[in-house]
Amino acid sequence: MQLKVPEHQVAGHIAKDGKPGPLVDDKGRFFKPLQGDSRGEIEVKFYESFSSNTEVPEHIHRYFPVYHGTQAVEGSDGAAMMVLENLLAEYTKPSVMDVKMGSRTWYPDASEEYIQKCLKKDTGTTTVSSGFRISGFEVYDHKESSFWKPERKLLRGLDVDGARLTLRKFVSSNSLSDTGSKPDSAFASSVYGGSHGILTQLLELKTWFENQTLYHFNSCSILMVYENESILKGNDDDARPQVKLVDFAHVLDGNGVIDHNFLGGLCSFINFIREILQSPDESADS
């Protein structure tokens, strides 16, 4: 089995200090290392519960990666990894964005130290003010014929206007390395709009979250991806915009209570996307 480091990872853990990072194979599978503490166990437990939960509607299952169990992987010191669907396997030049949801990223019963660590990030980003923060993104810059990805520390400093600008950049055709140019949002209607676009998918998720009380998705992310190459070739219908939920290390049982933290962030994020669709040509302030 040939494994390699993912080309387009925009957020999450990477190989560091002797600890393995995620890997992908050529069969459309993504290998995610189990975190050594309870987080790895919680994420496996969630996937096992969710994948067999008949209370979750079939059309909602498609917003989550397919789970293939766990496996010890050679070359990673035999570390156990979750085997998931590689969400980018079918994309040639994917543009990808990771958005952490909720106005609070810690979970009930977390230690005071962990709460303070999360609170520092939450208050210093758009998490508290907008109910989400952009953790990472990468787009294919066709003018430069290369992928462009900002440093994570720059994203951590985004305010509300910066988040709005970044969501425009994600669907723009002009060069993103040129900081003096305004994003043109040229791909907004192809990616965010339409009957199969990002907004439609987010609204379908919102309908479910307005009623579901099975799980609370603490510190979970929405991953958005689309095929940049198809748009550049003029085939907007093959942009294949896709929304997936990822990162479930802090998911807890819902205990019959609506997940207002995630739902509130989702509603806010939907408003940002809808605003861009309503005014795609609007010049955004830098």
Swiss-Prot record:
Example of a GO biological process term: pollen development
GO molecular function, one term: ATP binding
Post-translational modification: Phosphorylated.
Annotated InterPro entries: IPK, IPK_sf
Enzyme Commission number(s): 2.7.1.140, 2.7.1.151
Catalytic activity: 1D-myo-inositol 1,4,5-trisphosphate + 2 ATP = 1D-myo-inositol 1,3,4,5,6-pentakisphosphate + 2 ADP + 2 H(+); 1D-myo-inositol 1,3,4,6-tetrakisphosphate + ATP = 1D-myo-inositol 1,3,4,5,6-pentakisphosphate + ADP + H(+)
Signal peptide positions on this chain: none
Sorted UniProt keywords: ATP-binding, Cell membrane, Kinase, Membrane, Nucleotide-binding, Nucleus, Transferase
Residue ranges of the region described as Disordered: 1-22
Induction remark: Not induced by auxin.
Note: Does not bind calmodulin.
Functional summary from the UniProt entry: Inositol phosphate kinase with a broad substrate specificity.
Name of the protein: Inositol polyphosphate multikinase alpha
Native organism: Arabidopsis thaliana
Lineage: Eukaryota, Viridiplantae, Streptophyta, Embryophyta, Tracheophyta
Chain's gene name: IPK2a
